[in-house]
Design a protein with these regions (language model features):
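Ferredoxin-type iron-sulfur electron-transfer modules and their immediate structural context
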Residues: 1-21, 25-28, 86
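Iron-sulfur cluster-binding cysteine motifs and their immediate structural context
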Residues: 17-34, 49-66
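Small-aliphatic-rich amphipathic alpha-helix that forms the alpha element of a beta-alpha
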Residues: 13, 108, 112, 182-184, ...
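Glycine/small-residue-rich phosphate/adenosyl-binding loop
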Residues: 127-199
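Short linker/helix segments within small regulatory modules
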Residues: 32-45
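Specificity-determining recognition surfaces
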Residues: 20, 71-106, 246-257
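A glycine-rich helix N-cap at a beta->alpha junction
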Residues: 147-155, 159, 234-257
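Short loop-to-beta-strand entry elements in the cores of soluble alpha/beta enzymes
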Residues: 121-130, 222
């Protein structure tokens, strides 16, 4: 059975870096260079470690893009810059009333898709609620759920009285989605037990990826709870059948720095 790796024999030094990097131990080094074992045909997780680890750039993988996106190695030495970005992250609850260009949101999600997923299954799906009117509909659906909670004399998550949030909404103040211009929702297949963790990791990565673009974010926890507990809210979000929301971010330009 053919190997799923292609090797440039004139470049390969048979150093074994690719075999050492393979998390599934699917690569063997022979006289003609590395080859994959038969099990790799079905079980390779397509992580790309083998190609990335080759110091000579001699490997290509039949199921991966021919060229990997190059990395600027300078970032590895900027420990202070990375730490400052992580420490400087804030939950933003006041936004400028202007849209973010779609290309910028796409760039944020493009970075977020590199967040880790179990076995490289990449189960995260995205829904971007772009128009402000649609964002307000989701906030309204969440308020409807809270009205029902108040009417039943219950508390949100067994702790919080939602009536002040409902009163604020009725007074024209949105404390649910903070009048943000956009919402990013991460969701996955309901039958995939790894989707929840992957979505949370991806949203966390999106938070950081948004910072260099001058964007602020905040987790939309009330919307998430409504989506889990209130069928009309789930319907308002409009996910594909068999899918479940695992988290959401408000996103936009901060009104204050």
């Amino acid at each position: 059975m053919a190997s799923i790796l292609s090797v440039e024999s004139n470049t390969c030094t048979r150093c074994g870096s690719c075999a050492a990097a393979c998390p599934m131990a699917f690569i063997r080094i022979g006289a003609k260079g590395p080859r994959t074992v038969p099990a790799a045909q079905e079980a390779c997780m397509l992580c790309g470690h083998c190609v990335a680890a080759c110091p000579a750039g001699a490997l290509s993988h039949s199921r991966l893009a021919e060229h990997f996106a190059p990395l600027d190695e300078a970032w590895r030495g900027d420990v202070h810059g990375v730490e400052q970005m992580i420490k400087g992250r804030r939950s933003i609850r006041k936004y400028q009333q202007r849209q973010v260009d779609r290309s910028v949101l796409t760039a944020v999600l493009e970075a977020a898709r590199y967040a880790p997923t179990a076995m490289n299954t990449q189960p995260v799906k995205w829904l971007v609620v772009y128009e402000a009117a649609e964002v307000r509909k989701l906030a309204a659906a969440t308020i409807d759920w809270m009205r029902a909670v108040v009417a039943e004399g219950k508390l949100v998550a067994g702790k919080y009285d939602p009536s002040p949030l409902v009163m604020a909404w009725d007074g024209g103040v949105d404390l649910i989605l903070r009048a943000c211009p956009h919402v990013i929702i991460a969701y996955g297949r309901q039958d995939n037990p790894m989707a929840a963790g992957a979505c949370i990791a991806a949203l966390t990565t999106a938070e950081l990826a948004a910072i260099p673009h001058g964007l602020g974010t905040c987790w939309a926890g009330f919307l998430h709870m409504a989506a889990m507990l209130h069928p009309p809210a789930r319907e308002a979000i409009g996910l594909d059948d068999g899918c479940v929301m695992h988290g959401a971010l408000m996103i936009g330009y901060p009104a204050e720095q």
